[in-house]
A protein has these predicted regions:
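An acidic/histidine-cluster motif and surrounding catalytic segment
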Residues: 1-91, 96-296
């Protein structure tokens, strides 16, 4: 879990995690980034006091950064360290709330697909698409809102956006990468290259995409994005369009469609992305969100 200076959000994330039966069998590793300015100092201090009081997990390890790394560098460093030690990782940031069945889904998914070299990650959030989705489905690429992966998949991660961008252009994959031109992922890579973004997630998506690897999404979200704003936010403010009804039952693996990518799912994502353009009053937040999703 990655935290910064938002005490209330950190508490909420932990409270939801503890509602998972698997929490008491789970090793919780918390990365607490250092304040990047004086304004964040008090929030970081209070958040660190709280995380040192947490109980209810099998074990708890806290890494307090001495200097501000920024979320992108902190996540890349933390995930790399954990998969090198444990071979797998479940990743949460402090502005995500999870279903009581989140850890069950993640652990079962990690076990089920460990040997599937074409699967990059297990993801807990799915957009509130209009069409009913299968119990779980595969989409090409990787994602970043409550996810899990293995060392063998994280090893394909490339943090060089220029390399990724050139590969996508050379293979003429821009349209597919952008979900039929419905979402500006290629632009995110370009922003990363020119220095106007500092992203890990767009590089994670592109790395898996170029290797023809897939992410498993639940048909109904097991993760909710908390509506937060300000300097401590890891995702920026959350437009209403992204809010979901969280799944209240476990995943039924007998109903999962996991043989190949779901074309139905891709189309549903595309339609959702296009629908965002109708949210005129949320355009500023949407642009912030695109940046915050991938400025990490």
């Amino acid at each position: 879990m990655f935290t910064y200076c938002r005490l209330a959000n950190t508490k909420e994330t932990i409270e939801h995690l503890l509602k998972n039966d698997e929490a008491k069998y789970s090793d919780l590793i918390i990365y607490s980034d250092a304040p990047k300015n004086e304004r964040a100092e008090e929030g970081v201090k209070k958040t660190r006091e709280f995380i040192h009081s947490i109980s209810g997990f099998k074990s708890i390890k806290i890494i307090e950064r001495e200097k501000n790394m920024g979320l992108a560098n902190s996540i890349v460093d933390g995930v790399t360290s954990i998969v090198n030690q444990y071979g797998r990782v479940i990743v949460l940031e402090d502005d995500l709330s999870v279903s009581p069945y989140f850890l069950k889904y993640m652990n079962e998914g990690l076990d089920r697909y460990e040997e599937r070299k074409d699967i990059a990650s297990i993801h807990g959030y799915i957009y509130p698409v209009k069409k009913k989705m299968p119990e779980a489905l595969l989409i090409k690429g990787a994602d970043c809102w409550g996810w899990a992966t293995w060392k063998r998949a994280w090893d394909v991660f490339c943090f060089d956006a220029n390399v990724l961008y050139k590969k996508i252009l050379n293979a003429h994959l821009e349209r597919e990468f952008d979900f039929n031109n419905s979402y500006p992922y290629v632009d995110m890579l370009k922003r990363q290259i020119d220095g106007s973004a500092g992203s890990w997630a767009i590089c994670w998506y592109a790395s898996a995409f170029l290797k023809n690897m897939y992410t498993l999404y639940p048909g109904q979200s097991l993760v909710q994005l908390n509506d937060i704003v300000g300097d401590g936010a890891t995702h920026g403010s959350t437009p209403i369009a992204y809010l979901v009804d969280v799944k209240s039952t476990p995943i039924n693996w007998n109903l999962v469609e996991d043989q190949t990518e779901s074309l139905e799912g891709r189309k549903a994502f595309e339609l959702f992305f296009k629908s965002l353009k109708t949210w005129k009053s949320y355009i500023p937040n949407f642009l912030i969100k695109v940046m915050r999703i991938f400025v990490r």
